[in-house]
Every structure is written in structure tokens, then in C-alpha cells.
């Protein structure tokens, strides 16, 4: 990897995809289909898990070893995912608590609530702040029932704005909103970018992460980066295009810079999306191979992607947003259990998980 790089995964999860965790019938199955479809379609050979071995309850320990032993990550933000197609939201509060209590040197956490139920959302946020000491809030743009989908918008003064204000009052720094990739047969309306504008303008002291930024709506995302200094791009899933469709990843990055300027590179954050996908392949490709082609640089006026820029994207941007220091964090994890295991050599993909031996 790049010398002296401190790698941060801006959004990791440990999903429970078991059928007995379904809460919304066909919509639950559709969300799981979307996850496994992304996993299989964006993973290289040797990193693909068959559906029957994939749709289970992934433990926090598995996510941790995939990141810190099987891959070269140093730190991660573990999200509570409020996807109410699952009884526990998909990635439970309990797993986030485990991350904070068991490996505080390796994890921060984001709380997660469903804004469609405003009073419950506010109460749950306060409870999670007390329990988890989160630094941010994870949101999804729609909610599910057994037979319907209900969406909401980031610029809604009655649903969204009171939640953002409460997050600020509770000391949270960031709101991460899932965009661009629809979860199942749901209206695309709520996955578009337009509603972020008013939220970013109304809450300049909150940082808004566009999760899956650039996977769709590249120009809209870029213009938000250009206009709002508190809008950031979280590359979860988008990063995996680097391996599966490198030309598409190049176009995403070029589009963000072309419309937002080189300053956008200070607000793009690396993320793997583990456990949906294995975190190692896109990281390795980005470090070793990502560069704009000479033709594209000349045609679009793009900069060379230096090691310094890669260090920012891979970790320093996230750390700056949250007021963290890479050197201090690196000292905190020296000689911990993951560092010891990694020093023995990198295991094969999924060798430290219950999916050992099933990668295709």
C-alpha cells in the first residue's frame, strides 16, 4: 500500500440478513436481493459468496477481521442501519454497542433512526446517544411496511429539520444519508439529490455525507460539493466500481472534480460497505492502480491523483471531519489483537469468517 497511509472505512456494517429477521415481506426479500446482487456483481472472482452462505447474521467480529486482518484498514465507522424492512434495522444497536465497548480503538459509531416516525426517531436518537456515544447519524430515505413504502425528504421542515436540530443539540457532527442506490422496488424520487440542498443550507454546522455518492447523479452530487462546504461524498459501494468497472469509477471521480473543482478531493471519503462486500479488493486497486488516463487528464483538465490525494480520500478527510488525529489513532492500535494477526500474513478472503471456504 501507499507508505504512511492510515486507512479509514467511513461506513461498515454487520448485517443480519436471515429470513427470520424480515419485517416487511417482499420488500425485505428485495433489500436482501439488492445486497447480494451488489455483492456478487461488484466483487472479483475469489470474493463472491453464494446466496445461501451470504444471507445470514454477520457478526461484528467478522466485520472487524475482514477489515483489520484480511484487509489493510486501520479504523472504521460502524453504522446502526435503520432499515425497517428488518426487525433489528439490519445492523442493530447492539452490534454498534459491541463495537464501542470491545474495540474502541478501532471503531466509532453512527446512530440510526427512521424519520418517517418522528417522535420515535427523536426518542431513539437520544437513547442511542446515551448508549453508544455516536459521532453521527445514519438515515435511509424510505420506510417499509408489509405492503407499502413511505418516503421522506431531507428538506422537509416538519420531519427532517427537527431531527437535524436534535442531532446538533446532542453534539453529533454528521448526518449520513443513503442516496443513489434504491433498495428494492421503491420510488426513485427519495434517492435523488435535490432535497439535500435546503438541508445543507439550513444546517451549516452539520456535515452531510452522501452515502453511495456518485453511483448515480454524478453532476448533481458535484454541484452540491461545489455549493455547500458541508456536503461530503461517502464512496461506499461506489468504491467497488474501481474493481468491477474501473472506467465507470474513473468517470465518477472525473465528474466530481470537473464540476466541483479540485477542492472536492478534500470532501471525498473512502468506504467499503463491509459486510455487504469484502473491503480488500477496491482498496488494493485504488492504492496501486487508480489514476486518470493521460487522455482524460488532457481532455478534462484533471489533476494527477498523487499519493497525497489518495491519503486524504483513504482516511485523512474522514479524520478531519471528526477532529481525529491519525498518529494518535495509530498509536492506540499498536500491538492490538488485529495488528498481531495481520503481522502473521494476510489470510485468504473470508478465511476469518463463517464463510470460510465458500468464496467463488
Model-predicted segments: where are they?
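Short aromatic-enriched loop/helix-cap "lid" or pocket-rim segments at secondary-structure transitions
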Residues: 18-24, 90, 122-124, 149-152, ...
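Catalytic pocket-lining loop regions of alpha/beta-barrel enzymes
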Residues: 31, 135-136, 149-270, 275, ...
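Glycine-rich, phosphate-binding/catalytic loops in enzymes
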Residues: 23-28, 94-95, 193, 227, ...
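Active-site gating/metal-coordination segments in enzymes
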Residues: 74-182, 187-190
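Histidine-centered divalent metal-coordination motifs
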Residues: 11-17, 178, 212
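Divalent metal-coordination and catalytic microenvironments
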Residues: 11, 68, 76, 109, ...
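Alpha-helical scaffolding within the catalytic cores
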Residues: 58-64, 91-97, 121-125, 193-196, ...
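Mid-to-C-terminal alpha-helical segments outside catalytic/metal-binding sites
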Residues: 1-10, 17-66, 262-267, 277-360
